[in-house]
Amino acid sequence: MNDTAVKVDKIFRPFTVIRERQRSYPVDVDALAADLDISVVRKDWPDNVSGAIGKDGRGYFIIVNSNHPKVHQRFTLAHEIAHYVLHRDQIGKDGIKDTWMYRSKISDPDERAANKLAAEILMPADLLGRAAVENGLQLNERNLDALATALDVSTTALAIRLGVPA
């Protein structure tokens, strides 16, 4: 493979892998991380720290706060995967640590981009529609809880994704 092909593969491979994992819901983000050769560790951390992504001699790794609710852990993992996809060049030895109030060493626009991609990973439009149809639901605020349960996401994350009040 020549240099250009390697660069193109580095850019597009993660998106191809994401789409493969989005064939069914809820999206298996742990398997997605494994497919991308990212190790995942759940750790007992303070409540104000959600997760982190870093790189060491063995490759990329993500740490997720095991004290948070499962749906929050799933979003955090998707968010850190999004950092891998979008900001690999910024992930150094110190990694990127995400807290509720502070995002370390990375700009707010980059955090918003990671949040947006995390939502797209967990709740792509085609899966939203399919989950609604298969569960006999309309995509509206009255059905947020049922649809969030089907997708294994928080009601708040789903409401933001749909642009409706939570």
Listing of model-derived features with the role each one plays in the protein:
Residues 1-166:
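Active-site hotspot residues in diverse enzymes, especially metal/ion-binding acidic/histidine motifs
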